Amino acid sequence: MNYGYVYDPARIAAAKERMTSAGFATSFDADRPHLKGNWERLKSLGVTMVLAQVDELKATGINRPSNEQRRGSCVLQGSGRSIVDKLNTMIADKSIVCEPTEVAAEVMYGYERKKHWSQTHPWGCQCGSCPDGLTGQDAAEFYATMGVVPRGIYGGVDLSKPNEQLAILWNNIGVPSNLLDVASNHKIICHASRTWDEYADAISAKHWGWICLPGICQAHSIDADNCCRIDGAGGHCTECCGIVVLPNGETAFIIQQSWGNAIKYPPTIQTASGPIQLRQGSYAVRQSELERLGTQVERHSCDIPTSSAF
């Protein structure tokens, strides 16, 4: 089964090198040194949770349900939603003045897939055997260097609603150039974190992001605090949309899946401040559970410059 995340260390390193050579920041720790130790500072002040769903509710009036992924487009789903959540946070805290906006990450997916398969399939893949999927760094490179497209209709191309099939089509024929022109007005700052402690600093500072793991979390495999265990095979990318302190003082990350109602995770988790209800499709994973996965992971976070206002 292909969940849509491709782990390719050489490709990840090459994308980071291209970004660095072009003057784009790639390291959260290096680019945001003032946030080093942010999560520990917040905990010392009594903070036990930082959740994207709180800002989403404040900015939009609702907590949107999970995306409805049907293909191996998880990098599209996880990265796109993290950018939307970051925009909602900026609207909620009044650091940007605009209407809540969804982004069409299909543009990123089609462009990056076409780019990486062009050598073996110069005129588009017709073999039917190539897997779906990208690395998490593919998405980061596109958003930082090319930008994102707000949902809407552009010259007859309807991006007003999610459309996985359009993203797959663009794997073959390429993304229309007018969409890349739109994207260039909305570039995103994307960082990678080297450790889960560093990532805790990013997420607790509300730099929501996407994580890519060599496994999936099963709804039936939970502990006493309703945290999920990673016990399923298959590379997968999901949004990371929060961080909490558990009753025993451990840290857990809040993850947002993109499979609609296909998997029903526990709606409530236990925290140091008592039980909290998560938005539909979200679940908690202990940091210690994530750390046991080793180095075959990617941890990305995002920020939106005010010059990229939607």
Labelled PLM ranges:
Residues 96-121:
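Acidic helix-start/capping segments at beta-turn-to-alpha-helix junctions
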Residues 1-98, 102, 124, 128-148, ...:
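Structured alpha-helical subdomains that flank or immediately precede key functional sites
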Residues 2-7, 70, 76, 80-84, ...:
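Predominantly the structural core of cysteine protease catalytic domains
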